[in-house]
């Protein structure tokens, strides 16, 4: 009998971490940091993903229940002082079909989630929150003209964004909540160093219409042409609860 509640917590990580599936260049350092993309030079075109090993039931076709969930994590993105490119390309938290794999051609601004042949297709069945540290119309024409937090549904072109000035080497704390009754997804990012925070909310995000019943959750990241650029997750908490959908349609 599966419980309607699920939660897990990683205060830190260990090499060859149990309960985490590593894809591409993702790994855990001896310092207990989840390194989503390649660390050793060159990091150019590195892609990595780290997923919680157990699939999570996000809705139930029999009972009609849809999960509310919350996740919190701390991360750092950093490049070397002599790096000529400012921020390439970013980190994302995502939900995707269980046992999902990295698509071919999804490095750089595609975050290891999408590629040109599948972008915007409902068959992707992906919801992601991207922390995009690079913008440039030449390479990423879908992006707004600023570094940002974006909520993505089946496409690298975000449905909602808010400006966020990426800070090289600084810890960022993130809280993401989804409320099933209101179908609202809210993202809050704050910098403990000075308390600055940004919030973005998307309404009418219908998990049942977008995702399969069972999903994998985790992190993905991509690097473009930067020779040395790191995406590090320091800690991660996740909890979900299947509940009867109270909203009437």
UniProtKB/Swiss-Prot annotation:
Q: Which residues bind Mn(2+)?
A: 130, 132, 145, 148
Instruction: Extract the InterPro entries matched here.
Output: ConA-like_dom_sf, L-lectin, Lectin_LegA_CS, Lectin_legB_Mn/Ca_BS, Legume_lectin_dom, Leguminous_Lectin
Q: Which residues are glycosylated?
A: 118, 245
- Which keywords does UniProt give here? Calcium, Glycoprotein, Lectin, Manganese, Metal-binding
Q: Which domain of life is it from?
A: Eukaryota
**Database matches in PANTHER family:** CONCANAVALIN A-LIKE LECTIN FAMILY PROTEIN, LECTIN
Name assigned to this protein = Anti-H(O) lectin 2
Name its species. Ulex europaeus (Furze)
